């Protein structure tokens, strides 16, 4: 495993399957979780200030500006398929371990992922 891969730090939303959290920790990633009920603005600010990739099932975060959140991974893999989620997440990590993900939105699907830029502040 490359050291650059471990440079990614994650902030997991309360709606993310615990098996993904355990997987990331088992790979020695820096993973932070948030208290249940934390406000979206607080989550975005924590992601930005700590340069953490925010992982969520919530589509609301896909419209946040790159000035207000560091990076968003929007999970589109069904929550009742945690094994598929881990396989998809692992493939995505292998393809992004050397990339600067600041200001990006990653849409993670069961068989693929898409990377695009988050919108800029209007």
Regions found by a protein language model. Name each.
Residues 66-74:
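Ligand-binding "clamshell"
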Residues 40-45, 67, 81-90:
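Short, charged, surface-exposed secondary-structure boundary motifs
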Residues 34-40, 60, 77-82:
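Short, acidic/turn-prone active-site loops that include or flank metal/cofactor-
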Residues 8-52:
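N-terminal first-folded block
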Residues 1-2, 8, 96-122:
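Charged phosphate-binding loop/patch that engages nucleotide di/tri-phosphates or the phosphate backbone
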Residues 47-65:
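Acidic, metal-binding active-site segment of PIN/NYN-like and related structure-specific nucleases
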Residues 73-111:
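Ser/Thr/Gly-rich flexible loops in soluble cytosolic domains mediating phosphotransfer, phosphorylation
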């Amino acid at each position: 495993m490359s050291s650059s891969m471990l440079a990614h730090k994650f902030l997991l939303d309360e709606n993310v399957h615990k098996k993904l959290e355990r997987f990331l920790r088992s790979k020695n990633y820096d993973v932070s979780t948030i208290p249940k009920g934390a406000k979206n603005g607080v989550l975005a600010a924590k992601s930005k200030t700590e340069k953490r990739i925010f992982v969520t099932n919530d589509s609301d975060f896909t419209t946040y500006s790159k000035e207000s959140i560091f990076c968003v991974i929007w999970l589109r893999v069904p929550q009742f398929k945690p094994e598929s989620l881990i396989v998809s997440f692992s493939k995505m990590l292998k393809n992004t371990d050397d990339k600067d993900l600041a200001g990006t939105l990653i849409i993670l699907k069961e068989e693929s992922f898409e990377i695009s830029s988050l919108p800029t502040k209007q």
